Amino acid sequence: MKFKKLIVCAMAAVLALGSQTATAQSLSPSTKWHWDKGTIVVDTPARPAGQQHVLGLTAPKIQTVRVAFVGLGMRGPGAVNRFCHIPGVEIVALCDYVAARAEGCQKYLKEQGLAPADIYSGEKGYEELCKRPDIDLVYVATDWDHHFPVAKCALENGKHTAIEVPSAMNLEQCWELINLSEKTRKHCMILENCCYDYYELRALQMAQAGVFGEVLRAEGAYIHNLDDFWGYYWSNPSNDPDKLGWRMKYNMENRGDVYATHGLGPVAQCLNIHRGDRFTTLVAMDTKSVHGKEYVEKKTGKPCNNYRNGDHTTTLMRTADGKVVEIQHNVMNPQPYNRLFKLTGTKGYATKYPSEAIALDKSQLSASGVQPQVDNLSSHGFLPQAEYNALMKKYESPIIKKYGEIGRQMGHGGMDYMMDARMVYCLQNGLPLDMDVYDLAEWCCLAELGSLSMDNNCAAVSFPDFTRGHWNDVKGYKHAYAPAADEAAAEAKAKAYTQGQKDAVAAAKLWDLYDAVAKAQNDKARAKAKKAYDKARAKVKAQMAKL
């Protein structure tokens, strides 16, 4: 009898392992999976009735992109500054949990002579912002925990949405953003700036042209020792009593590659993911936690026995077409900054770190349109500088040609500005954005899928199909461009609008009136100053509406 009970208990335990509901700490409650021949198969939920995919999604042209920013701590202020230099943009609202941070970003608008933005603050300030009818795009740059709720609110209120990375923290959030984008027919773009770095854009051009032959393997990473930065991350007063800062706290509580997109995004584009190929399976492994655990113990003065994330995480992925991708994450240990970015093809090789280089033999370089200047060229070594420079020039990206110079002036290497300018360009010209909601899901899901793998002895885990059957409809990744005449017309209108806005603001002395409100000594004086500002602001808005 006891033996029978043991057998029953053992069978129950085995069945529990194959339960359709994942229970690991960092997983979303709705994630369903089952075992199949040693692989964890993650289910793909059916597309709700009435929804259609958003591959190649376009929206009506927006002559003037009216944007609101939510989250103005670390990344947000730079985004506000960049948008002040993009023609055809109106910055309508600035929002942060802390009002002073939102108000502090007005300086960028003032410096460029643009109209002051409305300020929103507090834990739920973004909700009122998203309800406004005069906003086209909500740009989300909050802490990770608020990426999803703000984006969800924006999409539910009919706004195009752009979300800093990682844009979704688990599969449940990925699927909800997909469903909202499909339902509302609004763009939901992941703000993966590394796709716009100069080397990555040129390598993408080369991969698309077949310079490397067929790309079979790729590597990417986010390796960045954050010791100098941990103290600058905001501590949410409602859930961070130890003041660890949101990023350290998230790594303590969650396992997996929680920041995969910088390394994964650029190589996924080179591999045409959900544009002729798709990720099918991954296996993840991590080291034990040493540095993060020590940081928390030093910060709190208490033992930390529950630090989830390892110092270094490695994820291996396979695609339907037999390609392999390796992604690494390490923000803990002392080593040089590194995103790897390596492409191994049947006819060539590209690598970005520790220095940018290309390996091609003489015949392949010639076939790629560059004549070698040396006789002993071999793919066993990297191209000499002259040949390398010629190759880079030949495969220069149109995006760099258009935005590269001003991008470098805007800081952070220029890639942030090119990302933002391209997004505005596509919205103004009614084109598909460079990254869609399926990219967002594919690049962000490594956190949960990797955690599921590692929590089950590094088992293989299948990817859900975020396109739900449409990953092979589009053949090859590409950037969209408007016809030259349409592009020129949109650009002329954008520049005219921005100059008109600046002229109206200057004529009304709007910033003098705005500053007078803050300088008022009492309530009566403040009310009087506010009335004068509101009157002038309304006049400026009316003038801007005619531009």
Question: What are the residue ranges of the model-derived segments?
Answer:
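C-terminal segment of classical bacterial N-terminal signal peptides
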Residues: 16-23
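A structured beta-alpha segment of the ubiquitous adenosine-cofactor-binding alpha/beta core
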Residues: 117-136, 140
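C-terminal helical cap and adjacent loop that interface with cofactors, partners, or active-site loops
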Residues: 26-41, 45-47, 55, 77-78, ...
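Bacterial N-terminal signal peptides that target proteins for export
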Residues: 1-10
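Beta-strand-loop-alpha-helix segment that lines the small-molecule cofactor/substrate pocket
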Residues: 137, 143-144, 148-196, 210
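Predominantly a Rossmann-like dinucleotide-binding segment in NAD(P)-dependent oxidoreductases
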Residues: 187-189, 194-307, 457
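N-terminal Rossmann-like dinucleotide-binding module
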Residues: 27-112
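Active-site beta-strand termini and strand-to-loop segments that position acidic
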Residues: 315-321, 345
